[in-house]
UniProtKB/Swiss-Prot annotation:
Residues 702-779 are annotated as: Spacer. A motif (Cysteine switch) lies at residues 199-206. GO terms for cellular component: extracellular matrix; extracellular region. It is an enzyme of class 3 (hydrolase). Isoform 1 and isoform 2 are expressed at high levels in the lung, brain, whole eye and retina. Isoform 1 shows a weaker expression in the heart, kidney and skeletal muscle. Isoform 2 shows a weaker expression in the kidney, bone marrow and skeletal muscle. Isoform 1 and isoform 2 are expressed at high levels in the fetal heart, kidney, and whole eye, whereas a weak expression is seen in the fetal liver. One of its GO terms (biological process) is proteolysis. The conserved cysteine present in the cysteine-switch motif binds the catalytic zinc ion, thus inhibiting the enzyme. The dissociation of the cysteine from the zinc ion upon the activation-peptide release activates the enzyme. Zn(2+) binds at residues 201, 389, 393, 399. Residues 50-76 are annotated as: Disordered. Residues 543-598, 800-860, 861-922, 925-968, 972-1029 form the TSP type-1 domain. The active site is at residue 390. This is A disintegrin and metalloproteinase with thrombospondin motifs 17. Residues 1045-1084 form the PLAC domain. The lineage of its organism: Eukaryota, Metazoa, Chordata, Craniata, Vertebrata. It comes from Homo sapiens (Human). The gene is ADAMTS17.
Amino acid sequence: MCDGALLPPLVLPVLLLLVWGLDPGTAVGDAAADVEVVLPWRVRPDDVHLPPLPAAPGPRRRRRPRTPPAAPRARPGERALLLHLPAFGRDLYLQLRRDLRFLSRGFEVEEAGAARRRGRPAELCFYSGRVLGHPGSLVSLSACGAAGGLVGLIQLGQEQVLIQPLNNSQGPFSGREHLIRRKWSLTPSPSAEAQRPEQLCKVLTEKKKPTWGRPSRDWRERRNAIRLTSEHTVETLVVADADMVQYHGAEAAQRFILTVMNMVYNMFQHQSLGIKINIQVTKLVLLRQRPAKLSIGHHGERSLESFCHWQNEEYGGARYLGNNQVPGGKDDPPLVDAAVFVTRTDFCVHKDEPCDTVGIAYLGGVCSAKRKCVLAEDNGLNLAFTIAHELGHNLGMNHDDDHSSCAGRSHIMSGEWVKGRNPSDLSWSSCSRDDLENFLKSKVSTCLLVTDPRSQHTVRLPHKLPGMHYSANEQCQILFGMNATFCRNMEHLMCAGLWCLVEGDTSCKTKLDPPLDGTECGADKWCRAGECVSKTPIPEHVDGDWSPWGAWSMCSRTCGTGARFRQRKCDNPPPGPGGTHCPGASVEHAVCENLPCPKGLPSFRDQQCQAHDRLSPKKKGLLTAVVVDDKPCELYCSPLGKESPLLVADRVLDGTPCGPYETDLCVHGKCQKIGCDGIIGSAAKEDRCGVCSGDGKTCHLVKGDFSHARGTALKDSGKGSINSDWKIELPGEFQIAGTTVRYVRRGLWEKISAKGPTKLPLHLMVLLFHDQDYGIHYEYTVPVNRTAENQSEPEKPQDSLFIWTHSGWEGCSVQCGGGERRTIVSCTRIVNKTTTLVNDSDCPQASRPEPQVRRCNLHPCQSRWVAGPWSPCSATCEKGFQHREVTCVYQLQNGTHVATRPLYCPGPRPAAVQSCEGQDCLSIWEASEWSQCSASCGKGVWKRTVACTNSQGKCDASTRPRAEEACEDYSGCYEWKTGDWSTCSSTCGKGLQSRVVQCMHKVTGRHGSECPALSKPAPYRQCYQEVCNDRINANTITSPRLAALTYKCTRDQWTVYCRVIREKNLCQDMRWYQRCCQTCRDFYANKMRQPPPNS
């Protein structure tokens, strides 16, 4: 849907339905079309004769075809057909095979009335194939219905042939008259920018109560992460409301909805989404009447809730039982992941009255029994954009405006989504992609991982824009009914908004919706994204490929084992129209090693709880980490002295161990297996001898049982011990005999384990309490050159060779900025090509090599010096000192800063102490009175003088009073405005002139009464003309009121009676003069021009 992209291949049933409603006498769209009446015949392979292809002839009229010899009779539902079709001077041979890949076996169109009644299942009457002798050709036909005629599309390159039976013909399609039309495909162009509509969407969220106490363990959940697959299928139920079915008609509504859902399918195939989402319709329900349990009205939320309950009762059912899919028998209802209800009822958000809302959905409701619903208003083919937007909410996508990084841009999930673009022009934002990935990684999306095995998806059809299938007239009929046509006098504006004329109306009307992309708007032009642009070729098929991996991120930890990641983008090149998305993952994680953490440092999980505790306004130091077994990568913290953990974060930081004694790490919220080779997901394990991926032959296992113990204690010869001196230790880890010993106690059961190797002899002691004992089972290993613990060294056999080897690498000396790793030099014994690590004393010290050195952690440091604010000067007058805190900190992935060693920070340490000079005592500022506001009409400033009274001018600048301040004054905004003087009220002698005098605001132009009355200009003045005839008294028309009427006179009000008024000499009466001002004014003028009578 972004610029230059195209629609993916259309699904077969949509193309078939596009031609069912054509009038035989009407061409499709505005493209040139030929019409013929032909007789298709079924033939045998021996009857096929492929002559050379002639050039395409010009337009033709109807002709009657010849009748070929007898052929096999076609029977509906056959698997394969070979048809002969004489068309436009050519013999076309159609090789067809029955094709049901676009439907699930359980798909059906159901018409439901007052009593629920299922329609018959779809017939096995859909065929697809090719035209023999025409490489790249495509045929999609149906032979459905009682009449059994052929309906569908034949495509030969850029030429399309539409076929349907004549209305007056009956019988099987073989040998039956059919009407064919030929049109030439047009090439699409890159889209232009579109306009934003003001249409509203409402997303409903589920309110969750906070969980206290230990979280419950859902038996359906597993520790292993749900891996993000490259393809997911949303099996969708679509229900058409009764008012929509009545408006369009059942057949047209079926065609319309399938076309819309195909557009929705194409939008979710767009490369910008990054994940292939198949929106597949499993059932279409056409309501003849609304069921009693389904309440649809103006209140949007109530309508959506009612539909959700109704669809769950009618078409719901358990999709999963634990982690097992419910088997699908032939009588089972089709699986439903989402449900869409389309209505022509105008609904609204939060109120029970019509408004501009066009869609409502539950956020993240897919797969939920009573939240997987979308409510959409039928507003023409733009319904596709509404459904795509709301299904995005259903799949966990928020509005782009909810993300600061995506706000203010034009994408499908914009708060006011862009209308006027089609699926080839609209794209998904990176925030929508991230929201979708997070939703699909959650366990609530598991229904999308299993698709109805009866479903088939693909069919190879050419890319077409929707406006190439619906002409402007047909789009008007969808919006305003079958009596509507396109307004030709609005053709110059048609791409900005589709204007239609309904039969019987005198003016055109519009819903401000642009026509579909591909609608012709002139010679070699069509509408794209709301503009009329030239046609350009369709881009070629291009599969996406990955860009090179980016640089590794910083390690998530400053000490110990952590995780880092790197990213790549599918833009080298990006997937083109119909192209596939890049296979594999866009993010890769790896283990990173740092220097061991200092002793006494809290665990990484505890540090995260403490960081949250520091940010909390409550008392500090109260939270400690708790690992929940079935949710190891969620951060639970427990208040001190309480056993109820609190969920603090949905996931811990990358590199957090999954448990206190585990090597597996949490990465992106999922517990990942870490092999002994340090690779995420590796299956490498240490053998019993502690060798990674070893065969267990380098050591000898010693084990046995001892049955005289009640409690156990462990002690080395260096006096380190556990449970000694009659003291019982808490479970944990202890450093004894040069190794880490782990002690676990559960009730009376105890376990002591250590990885080794030990450097001192260990003594296992038994503490005897009471009389009952439970026994001890022990196991330990010794190198093959030793037989038992504390046994003296055996003599070295003559065939043994002891040499120094580099057995491994130490950790990096620094965590960033470039450090060194050194090899571990070990003594190795070689016997019969078998190597074994032995004590260093077995090898000669004189030949011990120097360790090898390698550079490591070359990435820049994220550690930096952080300096706090300076303290106040130690002296209030004269010289003193200031102090501040300077710390070396490291930034974690979540933005939290933790203190680290000063050697990790680059550059010199900022100064922590500096000299300062206190302000001289008794230094004060002096300010004068405020001046008048600098503006008399609007905003201005007050000003005053501010001076330092100290002789040296060392007043504290931070306490200096303001010298300017904003002010507003509107006292001088009104003034007198005058109009032009009118013509003189008299044509002779003395008269009056008038003008308009008004008090108006300088800025707004509004009338007011604040102007000074003394300065008001005169509204009247005297004027003088030539001397008048004495017979007419000039004063009768020179009064101010009569002059004003004369000035304002435009025409007579009583045209019929004004001649009588003049003859009866009634013009001097102001009441009659006002109604016949033009006649009376001319009467006086003529009187003044007449000469006086002879005396």
